[in-house]
Regions:
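Substrate-binding groove/exosite segments of carbohydrate-active enzymes
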Residues: 1-107, 215-229, 238, 262-296, ...
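Catalytic cores of carbohydrate-active enzymes
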Residues: 1-8, 43-46, 124-140, 147-153, ...
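Charged catalytic carboxylate motif
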Residues: 24, 88, 112, 157, ...
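Aromatic-lined carbohydrate-binding surfaces of glycoside hydrolases
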Residues: 36-37, 113, 137
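Short, well-structured alpha-helical patches and their helix-loop capping segments
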Residues: 81, 85, 105, 112, ...
Length: 331
């Protein structure tokens, strides 16, 4: 699955609690809670000239690597790295709390959650419009750039985190009003500016500059995050999944000895040209989309997509039983 390096938000952490490994999950979250940068409170924005200004200079103390940033190595808050792994890590932590109900651990980690939300707002919603930029924040992010625009999936992550923070604050007897207000603000911004009613889909993002156009052909990550983070209402979920069904390429699985003739994979987008992380046939993206079908009430499509991904990976892949990153049908 290409876990070649320490990074705090690999999807694997989601699996610990369903497997009953609550202690392992807690160890993971504690270790990376200790990796959160505490100071300075903020810093300068310094584009990296060695990376054609496409990244921030990886230096602790710069804007992205200031208070709230979670470093890539456990129990070490001194290493700057270009990914925003905070978003997914905090989502995993919140899901862990929902599995375990561990109030004592919540209280211990509460400052980590607060600093994270402040960091996200400070760095990625600079204009305060409720739409957050996406800077290397999800698996597919390597070649995704939005130039400061408002992105559906990162805004959805921040909506859910703020909504849950308000609920968690109440459990601890704290005032969660600011988190609830931010969640309401984000939700309204997404619905007003990123829902494309004519097409029945959430846009990928809205340009920051120029005519502030909305990119109306999202990747599957936009669809499943909108559903998973509870941005989409039932009608929007249905229409968004119809977009996946009708607009995202479906690839039949054909193999010698395979008796099933109704298995199909999907690519992550309908974008061209093909390049890494922009248009792939990736197992995790396929099964996450299958989860969205389940969450959207389309269980038959969900099962068929899930089955297709597992059959291709575990039975037709390079190694029997493997859970691959990219499938054979990837270009």
């Amino acid at each position: 699955v290409a876990w070649r390096m320490h990074l705090n938000a690999w999807r694997g952490a989601y699996a610990a609690d369903p497997l009953g490994w609550h202690d392992r999950a807690k160890t993971h979250f504690m270790a990376y809670g200790n990796s959160q940068v505490l100071a300075p409170a903020f810093g300068p924005i310094v584009p990296d000239t060695t990376r054609n200004l496409a990244r921030q200079e990886e230096k602790i103390g710069n804007a992205m690597f200031s208070s709230g940033y979670i470093s890539r190595h456990p129990n070490n808050n001194t290493v700057a790295h270009h990914y925003d792994m905070n978003l997914v890590f905090i989502d995993q932590f919140i899901r862990h709390l929902k599995w375990t109900g561990d109030i004592e651990f919540l209280e211990e980690m509460w400052p980590v959650l607060e600093r994270h939300l402040e960091w996200e707002k400070r760095n990625y919603d600079v204009d305060g419009d409720g739409l957050y930029d996406a800077y290397a924040a999800i698996w597919a992010s390597d070649a995704l750039q939005y130039s400061g625009g408002g992105v559906t999936y990162t805004s959805a992550y921040n909506y859910y985190a703020n909504k849950m923070a308000a609920q968690l604050a109440a459990i601890l007897g704290k005032d969660g009003t600011s988190f609830a207000n931010e969640a309401t603000h984000i939700y309204a911004a997404i619905q007003k500016q990123l829902w494309v009613s004519e097409k029945g889909v959430f846009g990928e993002y809205k340009d920051l500059l120029g005519k502030k156009l909305v990119h109306e052909n999202p990747g599957v990550w936009t669809i499943y995050h909108a559903i998973d983070k509870e941005i989409a209402n039932p009608f929007q979920a249905y229409k968004s999944l119809e977009y996946v069904t009708n607009k995202i390429p479906h690839i039949p699985i054909v193999a010698e000895g395979l008796e099933k003739d109704d298995l199909q994979l999907i690519s992550t987008t309908n974008w061209q040209p093909y390049t890494w992380s922009i248009n792939n046939v990736a197992l995790a993206e396929i099964v996450h989309t299958a989860l969205a079908y389940w969450q959207g009430g389309q269980s038959e499509k969900a099962f068929k997509l899930w089955e297709s991904g597992l059959v291709e990976s575990m039975y037709l892949g390079a190694s029997p039983g493997a859970l691959e990153q990219l499938l054979f049908y990837d270009a």
